[in-house]
């Protein structure tokens, strides 16, 4: 999602009060200190924990207290490092730590699913909470998580739909964008009346069935917009391989050329309040897709506050921008093709922070002092 970026509460929140030291210390204790020791071994992992704390602050504290100011992740990180005793010694390095963390996130493997309807004429796309780009539901892998398991989890979080019974591990399309591997499993035959609704907060603004022929690039030179005007930064690179897959795997449900299926919005944050809105996508929606929006930083899509603390990741994903063909490679995997080697293990967490050491004894001392107090 995932890429999709969650948006802060700034559009609705007009508070100007910074979080108190008590609140910051509570968040630090809950999300950074009270975790397994292995998750405190590098700043990459620590920053992922800080990111969880950030989204808890935005989704709960800011929502419940209109006086609190909505912050960017970098602003929150700086405040937390200055407030937390065990993080304060590293404040002078905060810019380098945050820069390396953002770069590291762009190398974490991403998986998701290309969901096709029963006729294979339409695919399901999701749009981020803020911005107008569309993508297939997907997100970053957690530590030691298998590709297919990540895809199932991310699709469930972004759409509320469980693809575990339909996903075939050998059917996927894979690209490598610069240093980031992106694998999307092809999940075909999903019925139109399937109910979709994201489980995450402030991550997805719309879920829609889009016609594949409307997603085709407007020209060979422009792959970021479809013929209908939709922004397709995260979609266009997969369309050619998807078309080839469909030719080899005809749909069991006959198409009706005289009555083509329409694009269909199945969930919209503006019209769905705890429910599921359904509406046909009108031309006016397409016009809105053409509006240029400022690209969000890759640091803004953590994703759902994971119940399992991820060391590798959490939902943005690919950098939004024109994807040039010489920067990508693609693989369509089936029974008779050779599996792609996963180089993600070559990325050693903490490697970019080799000069920094997280002092575990200081953490334990701080916890003991807190308990005795």
UniProtKB/Swiss-Prot annotation:
ATP binds at residues 178, 233. GO terms for molecular function: 5'-(N(7)-methylguanosine 5'-triphospho)-[mRNA] hydrolase activity; ATP binding; magnesium ion binding; manganese ion binding; mRNA binding; protein homodimerization activity. Its cofactor is Mn(2+); Mg(2+). SMART domains: DCP2. Residues 298-323 have a biased composition (Basic and acidic residues). The keyword rRNA-binding does not apply. It catalyses: a 5'-end (N(7)-methyl 5'-triphosphoguanosine)-ribonucleoside in mRNA + H2O = N(7)-methyl-GDP + a 5'-end phospho-ribonucleoside in mRNA + 2 H(+). GO terms for biological process: deadenylation-dependent decapping of nuclear-transcribed mRNA; deadenylation-independent decapping of nuclear-transcribed mRNA; mRNA catabolic process; mRNA processing; nuclear-transcribed mRNA catabolic process, nonsense-mediated decay; post-embryonic development; post-transcriptional gene silencing; primary shoot apical meristem specification. Disruption phenotype: Lethal phenotype at the seedling cotyledon stage that are small and chlorotic, with disorganized veins, swollen root hairs, and altered epidermal cell morphology. Altered RNA decay. Homodimer. Catalytic component of the decapping complex. Interacts with DCP1, DCP5 and VCS. A motif (Nudix box) lies at residues 139-160. Catalytic component of the decapping complex necessary for the degradation of mRNAs, both in normal mRNA turnover and in nonsense-mediated mRNA decay. Removes the 7-methyl guanine cap structure from mRNA molecules, yielding a 5'-phosphorylated mRNA fragment and 7m-GDP. Essential for postembryonic development, especially during the formation of the shoot apical meristem (SAM). Keywords: ATP-binding, Cytoplasm, Hydrolase, Magnesium, Manganese, Metal-binding, mRNA processing, Nucleotide-binding, RNA-binding. Residues 275-342 are annotated as: Disordered. Mg(2+) binds at residues 154, 158. Its EC number is 3.6.1.62. It is found in: Cytoplasm, P-body. It comes from Arabidopsis thaliana. Residues 233-250 are annotated as: RNA binding. A motif (PDZ-binding) lies at residues 370-373. Residues 324-334 have a biased composition (Polar residues). Transmembrane segments: none annotated. Expressed in seedlings, mostly in root tips, root hairs, and the vascular system. Also present in roots, leaves, stems, and flowers. Residues 106-234 form the Nudix hydrolase domain. This is mRNA-decapping enzyme subunit 2. Changing residue 226 to A: Reduced mRNA decaping activity.
């Amino acid at each position: 999602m995932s890429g999709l970026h969650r948006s802060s509460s700034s559009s609705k929140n007009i508070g100007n009060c910074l979080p108190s030291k008590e609140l910051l210390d509570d968040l630090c204790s809950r999300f950074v200190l009270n975790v397994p020791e292995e998750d405190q071994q590098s700043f990459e992992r620590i920053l992922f924990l800080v990111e969880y704390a950030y989204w808890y602050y935005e989704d709960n504290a800011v929502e419940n207290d209109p006086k609190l100011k909505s912050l960017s992740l970098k602003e929150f990180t700086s405040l937390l490092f200055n407030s937390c005793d065990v993080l304060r010694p590293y404040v002078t390095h905060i810019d380098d730590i945050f820069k390396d963390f953002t770069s590291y996130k762009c190398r974490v493997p991403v998986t998701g699913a290309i969901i096709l309807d029963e006729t294979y004429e339409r695919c399901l796309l999701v749009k981020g909470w803020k911005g107008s780009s569309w993508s297939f539901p997907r997100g970053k892998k957690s530590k030691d998580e298998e590709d297919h398991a990540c895809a199932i989890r991310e699709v469930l979080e972004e759409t509320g739909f469980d693809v575990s019974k339909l996903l075939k591990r050998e059917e996927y399309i894979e690209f490598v964008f610069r240093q980031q591997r992106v694998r999307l499993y092809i999940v075909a035959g999903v019925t139109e009346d399937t109910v979709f609704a994201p489980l995450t907060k402030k991550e997805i603004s719309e879920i829609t069935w889009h016609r594949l022929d409307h997603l085709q690039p407007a020209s060979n030179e422009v792959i970021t917009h479809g013929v209908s005007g939709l922004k397709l930064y995260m979609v266009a690179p997969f369309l050619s391989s998807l078309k080839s897959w469909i030719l080899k795997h005809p749909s069991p449900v006959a198409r009706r050329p005289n009555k083509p299926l329409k694009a269909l919005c199945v969930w919209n944050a503006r019209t769905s309040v705890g429910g599921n809105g359904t509406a046909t996508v009108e031309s006016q929606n397409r016009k809105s897709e053409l509006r240029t929006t400022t690209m969000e930083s890759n640091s803004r899509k953590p994703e759902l506050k994971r119940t399992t603390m991820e060391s590798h990741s959490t939902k943005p994903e690919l950098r939004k921008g024109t994807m040039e063909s010489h920067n990508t490679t693609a693989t369509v995997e089936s029974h008779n093709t050779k599996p792609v080697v996963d180089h993600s293990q070559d990325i050693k967490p903490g490697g970019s922070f080799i000069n920094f050491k997280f002092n575990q004894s200081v953490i334990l001392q701080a916890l003991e002092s807190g308990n005795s107090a």
